[in-house]
């Protein structure tokens, strides 16, 4: 009787232990399957931080970035070709003849690092719109300059706006234009806008200077830059919203190495001054 009871207990316990072993084996197999899954399947589930723009809107964004680069360089071409007329009109001394051109490149080169850092923190669209708006204002101010000191100062301020525009435009194209040929075309068009604008500035600046004067060339560039600013308001992708409790000003104070930026900018200013 005791043997029969022991056999009964043995047969009833055996399936339980077998099912536990099979359960642990299946869990191990599932874990191994997850570990052996391709990386593409894992990364495909990760959310994208920036949305890719539709083709039509991406084209407008690229045109806006290219246009801002074009008209900034256009003004440099106008300055070069119209410099004798500008000198006679504004009474620019011989010792300051190079400064309407050099002041622009001096400030543009020295402020690029700072502008890129600010764009990363404050948002590319916000920084781009600020730069494009003040670019139009300072281009117009160059056309309205009454003496040599004013046009040099306005050209220097225009260089700062170009430094603000460039890294933000690059960031927008990098993050929101489809990777591959569309993005490559965006960078190519933006880079091509600089020499193309300078060439057009030389040609059209000479035509303006010989006919109606050099000032209207800046008026045309200012109106076009203002139009590109308005285009940017409607077409540039929205910046990511900051997390709760994080203001833009606080992030600017904490996330940017202001001492490093100041030292780097000072070095670039001195280098540009020597080369100028």
Where would I find each of the regions flagged by the language model?
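Conserved kink/hinge residues within transmembrane alpha-helices of Major Facilitator Superfamily
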Residues: 80, 105, 109-116, 201-202
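Extracytoplasmic
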Residues: 57-103, 111, 165-166, 170
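Residue-level signature of the transmembrane alpha-helical core
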Residues: 63-66, 70, 102, 106, ...
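Phenylalanine-glycine-rich, low-complexity intrinsically disordered regions
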Residues: 260, 265-276
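MFS transmembrane alpha-helix packing/gate-lining sites
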Residues: 75, 104-111, 161, 193-197
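Helix-loop-helix hairpins in multi-pass membrane proteins, especially solute transporters
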Residues: 120-259
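Cytosolic juxtamembrane N-terminal segment immediately preceding the first transmembrane helix
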Residues: 2-74, 88
């Amino acid at each position: 009787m005791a043997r029969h009871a022991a056999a009964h207990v043995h047969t009833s316990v055996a399936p339980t232990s077998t099912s536990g072993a099979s359960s642990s084996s299946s869990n191990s197999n599932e874990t191994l399957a997850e570990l052996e899954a391709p990386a593409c399947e894992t990364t495909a589930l990760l959310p994208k931080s920036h949305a890719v723009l539709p083709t039509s809107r991406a084209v407008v964004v690229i045109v806006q970035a290219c246009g801002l680069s074009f008209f900034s360089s256009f003004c440099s071409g106008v300055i070069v070709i119209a410099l004798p007329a500008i000198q006679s009109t504004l009474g620019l001394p011989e010792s300051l003849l190079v400064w309407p051109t050099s002041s622009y490149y001096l400030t543009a080169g020295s402020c690029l690092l700072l502008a890129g850092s600010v764009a990363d923190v404050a948002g590319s669209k916000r920084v781009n719109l600020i730069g494009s708006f003040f670019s139009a204002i300072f281009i117009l101010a160059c056309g309205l300059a009454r003496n040599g000191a004013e046009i040099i100062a306005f050209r220097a301020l225009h260089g700062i706006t170009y430094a603000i525009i460039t890294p933000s435009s690059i960031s927008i194209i990098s993050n929101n234009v489809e990777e591959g040929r569309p993005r490559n075309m965006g960078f190519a068009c933006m880079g091509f806008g600089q020499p193309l604008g300078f060439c057009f500035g030389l040609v059209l600046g000479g035509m303006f200077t010989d006919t109606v004067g050099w000032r209207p060339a800046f008026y045309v560039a200012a109106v076009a830059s203002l139009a590109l600013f308005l285009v940017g308001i409607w077409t540039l992708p929205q910046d990511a919203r900051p997390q709760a409790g994080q203001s833009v000003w606080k992030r600017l104070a904490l996330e940017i190495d202001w001492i490093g930026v100041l030292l780097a900018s000072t070095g670039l200013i001195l280098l540009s001054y020597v080369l100028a």
